[in-house]
Amino acid sequence: MSIPFSNTHYRIPQGFGNLLEGLTREILREQPDNIPAFAAAYFESLLEKREKTNFDPAEWGSKVEDRFYNNHAFEEQEPPEKSDPKQEESQISGKEEETSVTILDSSEEDKEKEEVAAVKIQAAFRGHIAREEAKKMKTNSLQNEEKEENK
């Protein structure tokens, strides 16, 4: 029973979403007739695997999910290292030279990637147009056959 306009949010246990995703994937893959019985057998097999290998996929999935959503690696900035000003100037000028070379190299690579992508897009579009024309021809021939049958 739900309460209209309620702001109640239930907390799903860690790893439960991963278990349901795995079950859903297997149901879609196997297409069973009796889904509740299939789910029971699936969870039984997961329990047996967990007991034999001491590996819990739900626990592992919750750790991965936690690491993904709670990644604090980019929140704090490292303080800059202090060194001689002369060394910093030489490092900066060296970096500028290196980046300009890499920019040219990457632009050539980008152009090649863009060309390949353009060819793929054009081929897909041409295929789409050809399929549309084939559909039109097929519907026209079906309509002509129906007209001939009606005569």
From Swiss-Prot:
InterPro entries: cAMP_dep_PK_reg_su_I/II_a/b, DD_CABYR_SP17, IQ_motif_EF-hand-BS, Sp17
UniProt GO molecular function: calmodulin binding
GO process terms (BP): binding of sperm to zona pellucida; epithelial cilium movement involved in extracellular fluid movement; single fertilization; spermatogenesis
Superkingdom, taxonomy of origin: Eukaryota
Membrane topology: Peripheral membrane protein
UniProt biased composition (Basic and acidic residues): 62-98
Subcellular location: Membrane
Renumbered residue ranges of the record's region Disordered: 56-115, 127-151
Quaternary structure (record): Homodimer. May interact with ROPN1.
Protein name: Sperm surface protein Sp17
Source organism: Homo sapiens
